[in-house]
Amino acid sequence: MTTLMVQGTTSDAGKSTLVTALCRWLTRQGVKVVPFKPQNMALNSAVTADGGEIGRAQAVQAQACFLAPHTDMNPVLLKPNSDTGAQVIIHGRAVTTMNAVAYHGYKEIAMQAVLESHRRLSESYPVIMVEGAGSPAEINLRANDIANMGFAEAVDCPVLLIADINRGGVFAHLVGTLELLSPSEQARVKGFIINRFRGDIALLQPGLDWLEARTGKPVVGVLPYVMDLHLEAEDGLDQRQTDKVEQVLNVVVPVLPRISNHTDFDPLRLHPQVNLQFIGPGQPIPPADLIILPGSKSVRSDLNYLRANGWETAIDRHLRYGGKLMGICGGLQMLGEHLHDPLGLEGAAGSSAGLGLLAMSTVLETEKQLRNVRGRLTLEDAEVSGYEIHAGVTTGAALEQAAVQLDDGRCDGAQSADGQILGTYLHGLFESPAACSALLRWAGLENVQSVDYHALRERDIERLADLVEKHLDGTLLRELCGLEAT
């Protein structure tokens, strides 16, 4: 068994994307490879077949390996619920909420979970492709590190260091990161990868030669800037749009301070007939055909944010003029009459008034609901699949008019009697082509084009593997993976 780790000089350097690319590149060669991220901090997550929760990036990487997501692929997941605290998820299950200081003391326990998962994967897969987190050179986070070099040292694996040249200062990033590592950690770095380059590679070559001479380490390759690559963002909100046709549906989403699983909106962002706008604090709220309240890791706090930024008034006006309103997960809970958090799971214990648009109330409970589901939208009997990640239990008369009839016999969500408002606990429902088309028609779009989001994701994964094949040193990569040269 061989473990190869990808670390980055910064956040968003391209670690997740490179691991996805390497996983598919190796899989195409018949190599049995599995993705792994020791510790992930993100509000975008996925549900595994065994009812656990992992980072969404690892679910995409699993797809690149043609594997079902498993909790061992991301044994530690941190989901921030305040500026200083986060829910700690170990092996797919929420175990506690901690502030940063408390978690620092918890890292030894977390490392045990990380090494346990790595050991289990090593028993079934000859190659483990690991993604680091942030930068390995964060001096204040070096003690008891489990996400980067601390893990690499523990399992004795080689490391590739990737940097984003599009940000500028790529050579300073690479050399500076290397020099901030200990001698043993520096020895683990077996090469550099430069990401998102655009221009004439000949103009970059003198810099590459200098880098290799300065560090004694090879440049494994230079990956080009790809304009229209659309894989789910691990954490940051992706607001890029595809080209639109003349007839579009205007969809508006508030950017909540604790927005979660905003990858729900990627299929809409890529749809040629949808103009998707994310509205941040202080921005004017534009007219829309459809307003969607997204998921939230701190629903009561984010509901206060909506009120403070004029959204409650804007929603009332929107509905008065015939617009459609949708809530997903935390957004569904906001649509009801009351939100109760008696245990203080998402902040201070207490209750808040909801928007009062659907006759229902929610109580937050300790046990989180985690499951992948299939069913049919009651709108058009359209097939839908998605996943539930929520701690709330919602009850009330509004649920009698469900939004989704699930295959397991349960009903999900609610619709208003006038058909203007719809809420659901299901994340990922826009990824189902039939359900997406049905919801867009409900919101007022005529002659809806069907878009297969899963096919688009698969196409992009294949494109990534092609880039590895063309631009990186395959012989060195195979050697680092413990494989013979082809």
From Swiss-Prot:
Positions annotated as active site in the UniProt record: 329 (nucleophile), 427
GO-annotated molecular function: ABC-type vitamin B12 transporter activity; catalytic activity
CDD domains: CobQ_N, GATase1_CobQ
Keyword line: Cobalamin biosynthesis, Glutamine amidotransferase
InterPro entries assigned to the protein according to its UniProt record, in alphabetical order: Class_I_gatase-like, CobQ/CobB/MinD/ParA_Nub-bd_dom, CobQ_GATase1, CobQ_N, CobQ_synth, GATase_3, P-loop_NTPase
Pfam families (alphabetical): CbiA, GATase_3
Domain GATase cobBQ-type: 248-435
Pathway where it operates: Cofactor biosynthesis; adenosylcobalamin biosynthesis
Any one GO biological process: cobalamin biosynthetic process
Function text: Catalyzes amidations at positions B, D, E, and G on adenosylcobyrinic A,C-diamide. NH(2) groups are provided by glutamine, and one molecule of ATP is hydrogenolyzed for each amidation.
Family that this chain belongs to: Belongs to the CobB/CobQ family. CobQ subfamily.
Family matches, as HAMAP family: CobQ
NCBIfam families: cobQ, PRK00784.1
Protein name: Cobyric acid synthase
Originating species: Pseudomonas syringae pv. tomato (strain ATCC BAA-871 / DC3000)
